[in-house]
From Swiss-Prot:
It is an enzyme of class 6 (ligase). Pfam families: Anticodon_1, tRNA-synt_1, zf-FPG_IleRS. Its cofactor is Zn(2+). This is Isoleucine--tRNA ligase. L-isoleucyl-5'-AMP binds at residue 555. A motif ('HIGH' region) lies at residues 57-67. Its main location: cytoplasm. It comes from Moorella thermoacetica (strain ATCC 39073 / JCM 9320). The keyword Ribonucleoprotein does not apply. The keyword Cytoplasm applies. It catalyses: tRNA(Ile) + L-isoleucine + ATP = L-isoleucyl-tRNA(Ile) + AMP + diphosphate. Its EC number is 6.1.1.5. A motif ('KMSKS' region) lies at residues 596-600. One of its GO terms (biological process) is isoleucyl-tRNA aminoacylation.
Length: 930
């Protein structure tokens, strides 16, 4: 007889092979055709809101792995909250203005932005941005990210632009907007000013020079003739703009005699400077404090101009001479200290970094050329003491990667000082995750200079300011802003560039200064950080499904100086509080060796390749597996490991489904009080899983979710529970209480796992959902299912502790079995008999388990010996269980053809001579019951 047909073998159509690259697009199509996002929103209407506001990615190029990390994290959070009782809409957005799009339009279309019609150029930029919005939208959707993809927010939309200039107008009305000549970060390659957030630092090799500034008037402190103050600089090209030398008021300065000349520098730096100059013999002539030297006048060795000694707290003794070359047109600290002394602000450069006529003999030279020319001229004039090179961290444009400069130009600024204290107070009321984020942004805001918000480019929102054509008065008021808002809503911001100023001002506008009705308009546009920093007002405050402030902003940690900062500034300036309740940041991407991903290293991972080869769910699991608050590692090897973890989870779910093929939840479920003890333990473990995972989701600790579920599948289920109950599932009568008890656990477990995993493995859980037994009225998608709740009646601390001890015994037995396999050629554990030699306490603990011990250990027989009985030589004792010794022998009897147990009862039933007594009874019952 073929006894395999009498077994309850697992069966399911749920595929063993995931085949995600092919299957995921089908599921994506199902979500779109059935408007799952809309159905989720409808189902959650009226519930408490949870608003995650999407920081807009830049509409330029295809997605990289950083986008993937960010968007999947957001999707995990949204899906969890929507399943757990919240109305959690997700409105994606794009940042669509700015320099990179201009550069691509110029490059791809062969345009000259200075020659082409400005409106035509802006239209080309718009087309380019919208092209990549559409490309990125499809790429984000392919990741399984759920959202209102048909109605995203775009910073180029007319309504958005209208609200943005409204924010600008509100800030101007409060006195926070001003125009001033001030040094700003300037990219000579992009020909525009930059904000702090657009600057990144990298190593640069720069000239290092020590220069003598001859003293013209020592204020009677020492003989000026033959005396010089020594400065050090790494930017020789800025020396033509020098107007002062800054000393620290409290530092000691010495005048030293070196040969025929006298040099003045900080006392602490004399030794390193003279070593560099190769000077061994010198004599200290006089000592002064910085304060005493204030007002001493030197001559700029390059220009026919005085350079006065001033005092500044910014002077340090870390490098140089303690005497700081000061050019207010080329440095913020120089500018600020210069303002106190009413120093002129010189900046003899044009937009491209070329010296103007104001640069005298250096006119026409670019910065690199000027560096060489300045050094050569200093040497010729005998003012150069030392010339060399140093490597140091230097600011670069984060768009074009070229080194940038400080350059004084007329720019528009937002006065951070006007609302700095309010912003600092607002920061304290926000929850920052990780907590160090609070200190980081607090210090940035505390130390931040005023925000340069003007850009000398074309593709952006214009600065909505008019000038009187007669007297030059700047004009911005409620009337001009509201009128422009209406024009922008109707025509978009292109109207500013398409029309003359007279067609843009409200009817009847007069200059409040001179009464003129003739106007011109500002030509600069706004910093794109002002664009995205206005999204809280343009999106959160206007979309009916959203709310202001947001519950959460989630971006990379670089956004403390970027979007978090600009959003905070515009919100505090106009509304008096932060636009977010919580801010969560993730780290950057690195390879396995901790190196930043870059094209030059060739260590990048293209998410499109991973999706093509492994599927989006593998990417999603990778995101969940990482402690993203630190830098996140990615490599081909890591993706392989994640794929293996995915397989483990999938195969566990498949096993659960396969053993529920004949289970009808409506009639076959076994109540708790009738369950076997092992099944009650498994249900207890399941409730603890729900509690632990839910807490981890609440705390945004998705790596804890991943590890907890993975361990539950690998350990609690596969290595313990499922291993033990296989015999019961396969060999017991199909409808027996014991088998149905186990199936009840499997049914509860798969129902919990499919929900707990949905925020992460969105595609796979949708597939599993279709194979769950019973429940014809189940929601169409697992994303519409409720979050699993802890069934407290199954929580049992006593049972937890009891089985913790039983499983310790099981682990020791497993070690003894493994040793026996190696020493006795034991083979399968069912060939074994296990002899337990316990002490009195362990004996009392194990005795009530009786025949269950063999089932738990997955052996054919367990003999529990009396306390005090001596174990044979070679028995195993585990340090963690000193009251127990284990000895393994072969089990007596024959192997049952049906259950594979070795039993002395095999052959006792003559009708079934190859079966053990238990199996023979089951088979006869099956025959009797037809």
């Amino acid at each position: 007889m073929d006894y395999s047909k009498t077994l309850n073998l697992p069966r399911t159509d749920f595929p063993m092979r995931a085949n995600l690259p092919q299957r995921e697009p089908e599921i994506l199509k199902f979500w779109e055709e059935n408007d799952i996002y809309g159905k989720v929103q409808e189902a959650n209407r009226g519930k408490p809101k949870f608003i995650l506001h999407d920081g807009p990615p830049y509409a330029n190029g295809h997605l990289h792995l950083g986008h993937t990390l960010n968007k999947i994290l957001k999707d995990i959070i949204i899906k969890y909250h929507s399943m757990n009782g919240y109305d959690a809409p997700y409105v994606p957005g794009w940042d669509t203005h700015g320099l990179p799009i201009e550069q691509q339009a110029i490059k791809n279309l062969g345009l000259n932005r200075h020659a082409v019609d400005v409106v035509e150029f802006r239209n080309r930029c718009r087309d380019y941005a919208l092209k990549y919005v559409n490309i990125q939208r499809e790429e984000f959707k392919r990741l399984g990210v759920r959202g209102d993809w048909e109605h995203p927010y775009l910073t180029l939309e007319p309504e958005y632009e209208a609200i943005q200039i409204g924010i600008f107008g509100e800030m101007a009305k409060k006195g926070y907007i001003y125009k001033g000549l001030k040094p700003v970060y300037w990219c000579t390659d992009c020909e525009t000013a930059l904000a702090e957030a657009e600057v990144e630092y990298g190593e640069e090799r720069s000239p290092s020079i020590y220069v003598k500034f001859p003293v013209a008037d020592a204020r009677g402190l020492f003989e000026p003739r033959g005396s010089s103050i020594v400065i050090w600089t790494t930017t020789p090209w800025t020396l033509p703009a020098n107007v002062a030398i800054a000393l620290h008021p409290e530092f000691k300065y010495v005048l030293i005699q070196v040969g025929e000349e006298r040099l003045l520098m900080a006392a602490e730096l004399v030794r390193p400077v003279l070593e560099l100059l190769g000077v061994k013999d010198y004599q200290v002539v006089a000592t002064f404090t910085g304060s005493e030297l204030e007002g001493v006048v030197c001559r700029n060795p390059l220009m026919d101009r005085d350079s006065v000694v001033i005092l500044g707290e910014h002077v340090t003794l870390e490098q140089g001479t303690g005497c700081v070359h000061t050019a207010p047109g080329h440095g913020l600290e120089d500018y600020e200290v210069g303002m106190r002394y009413h120093l002129p602000v010189l900046s003899p450069l044009d937009d491209r970094g070329r010296f103007t006529e104001e640069g005298g003999q250096f006119a026409g030279l670019f910065i690199d050329e000027a560096n060489k020319a300045v050094v050569k001229e200093l040497e010729a004039r005998g003012a150069l003491l030392h010339f060399g090179f140093i490597k140091h961290q230097y600011p670069h444009c984060w768009r074009c990667k070229h080194p940038i400069i400080f350059r004084a130009t007329e720019q528009w600024f937002a006065s951070i000082e006007g609302f700095r204290q309010e912003a600092l107070e607002a920061i304290k009321k926000v929850k920052w995750i990780p907590s160090w984020g609070e200190d980081r942004i607090y210090n940035m805001v505390a130390d931040r200079s005023d925000w340069c918000i003007s850009r000398q480019r074309t593709w952006g929102v214009p600065i909505p300011i008019f000038y009187c054509a007669n007297c030059g008065r700047e004009i911005i008021n409620d009337a001009t802003i509201s009128h422009l808002q209406e024009l922008f809503r109707k025509h978009g911001s292109n109207v500013w560039f398409a029309r003359e100023a007279g067609e843009l001002v409200p009817p009847g506008l007069k200059c409040p200064e001179c009464g003129s009705k003739e106007f011109r308009k500002e030509t600069d546009i706004m910093d794109v950080w002002f664009d995205s920093g206005s999204s809280h007002a343009a999106v959160l405050a206007t979309r009916p499904e959203l709310a202001w402030p947001a519950d959460l902003y989630l971006e990379g940690s670089d956004q403390h100086r970027g979007w978090f900062n600009s959003s905070l500034s515009t919100a505090v300036a106009t509304r008096g509080r932060a636009p977010y309740r919580q801010v969560l940041t993730h780290g950057f991407l690195v390879d396995e060796e901790g190196r930043k991903m870059s094209k030059s290293l060739g260590n990048g991972i293209d998410p499109a390749d991973v999706i093509r080869q492994r599927g989006a769910d593998v990417l999603r699991l990778w995101v969940a597996s990482a402690d993203y608050r630190r830098d996140v590692a990615a490599s081909e090897n890591i993706m392989r490991q994640i794929t293996e973890a995915y397989r483990k989870i999938r195969n566990t779910c498949r096993f659960l489904l396969a053993n529920l093929a004949d289970f009808d939840p409506g009639k076959d479920q076994v109540p708790r009080e009738e369950m076997l003890e092992l099944d009650r333990w498994a249900m207890n473990r399941l409730q603890r899983l729900i509690a632990r995972v839910t807490m981890a989701y609440d705390d945004y600790e998705f790596h804890v979710v991943y590890h907890t579920i993975h361990n539950f599948c690998a350990v609690d289920l596969s290595a313990v529970y499922l291993d033990i109950i296989k015999d019961r599932l396969y060999t017991w009568p199909a409808a027996s209480k014991g088998r149905r008890s186990a199936q009840t656990v499997l049914y509860e477990t798969i129902n919990v796992l499919v929900r707990l995993l949905t925020p992460i493995l969105a595609f796979t859980t949708e597939e599993i959902w279709r194979y769950l037994p019973g429940e014809d009225d189940r929601p169409i998608s697992v994303q519409l299912a409720g979050w699993p709740q802890v069934k407290t009646e199954f929580l049992d601390d006593e049972l937890e502790e009891k089985w913790k001890r039983i499983l310790q015994v099981r682990d020791v037995v497993a070690r003894a079995l493994e040793r026996a396999r190696q020493e006795q050629d034991l083979g399968n554990s069912l060939n074994a008999a296990v002899h337990l030699y316990p002490d009195a306490d362990m004996y009392q603990f194990l005795k009530p388990l009786g025949d269950e011990l063999a089932t738990i250990m997955i052996v054919s027989r367990v003999d529990l010996h009396q306390p005090g009985e001596e174990a044979p030589a070679g028995s195993l004792e585990a340090p963690e269980l000193p009251g127990l010794r284990v000895y393994v022998t072969g089990a007596p009897g024959q192997k049952c053809e049906r259950c594979w147990m070795v039993s002395e009862t095999v052959g006792q039933d003559t009708d079934h001579p190859t079966l053990c007594r238990r199996c023979a009874t089951v088979v006869k019952e099956m025959y009797m019951n037809g």
